[in-house]
Amino acid sequence: MGEHVRDEDLLEKVTNLAKRRGFFFPSAEIYGGFRSAYDYGPLGVNVLRNVKNAWWRSMVQMRVDVVGLDAAILGPPAIWAASGHLETFTDPLVDCRKCKERWREDKIDGVCPNCGSSEFTEARAFNLMFKTQAGPVEGEGATAYLRPETAQGMFTNFANVLATTRRKPPFGIAQVGKSFRNEITPQNSIFRTREFEQMEMEYFVPPAEADTWYRYWIETRHRWYLELGIAPEKLRLHEHAAADLSHYSRGTTDIEFDFPWGFDELEGIANRGDYDLTQHANASGVRLEYFDQANNERYVPYVIEPAAGATRAMMAFLLAAYEEDVVEGETRSVLRLHPRLAPYQVAVLPLSKKPDLEGLSREVLGLLQPHVMCDFDLTQSIGRRYRRQDEIGTPLCVTIDFDSLEDRAVTVRDRDTTAQTRVAIDELVATVLARLV
């Protein structure tokens, strides 16, 4: 491994890399862009899908006490009135009296980021929900909202899931999907945007067990980021003071990542108590509770909620993985992404475009594709192709050379060490899978 170079412009380097290599682009760029909106390119869509798949594997696939849900994005006002969003889902908005720009008051430290003025209007509550009309007839009866979080669909489906899965507390409902918040000051690339993807789980527990499960999920979710390659010193836990808690929370702890602008929220774990189920039960008239046959009693479960942003997590993984190494006197950019997150796990690289070599290379590609995501690259020198794969985070490169035609073996190159190993084609799939764990 080469000598590590100190990096002081990490955010700019990663966002430039993201655009140049096809991780994400400003949306509607040919029309001048659309603030706070991004389109995920060929590499980014793979990474984002891998982040969501890794979360789903950890939270649903590897457990028997959590099931999945995909609830509607559009919802009627009744849901958001009951949840408290119509009244309390706000940020403090101020206008700069000098340049007229609008800002979120608690994020600017009394100084306008645009012009430096310290003169602002009085703060006023700005609701972050997107309001729209459903159907062809305008009026209050047609009002709908884009969901600002995925959580409420899991609460309103509590009784449905309880009845159809025969689960009993403690159990969870998990969901991955788009949410929308009309942020006053979207910023820092894909970190804070108005359209984003969430990965949330509502874990329903007996009230007496809530604190135990709250601590359990803090530890479990913190460990997930470590297992996927984020260094311990890049993460910290921030427990909210009582005065800072959301209206529904009995306790909240954020997992924070050391972003280039400082530590900021990556995921929040909250003890929501029985607030949500009680609110929706009162508003709808439907009992949202569990009957404990063993003790012959009904109770409203408490809810422990680990809530993560998929797009925000993707950005943290990219920032944590980016390095510049000096290898053999040359500087290379490399994304040391965990193999489960990399856009491609393997790149198949024929040494030449000659038909017999390309034919064998496509045979090798066909062996690998059922097992891992593969790139196939014929262009430029092999050294440049290695550097390209390093820069996009591909853990392994498989090179097919002219000796391969004779000995039915290929060269497997490691992204992180640049070490190369000769492997028989018959053993390639097993070797690759073993190295990608």
What do the PLM-derived regions correspond to, one by one?
Residues 1-437:
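NTP/phosphate- and nucleic-acid-binding module
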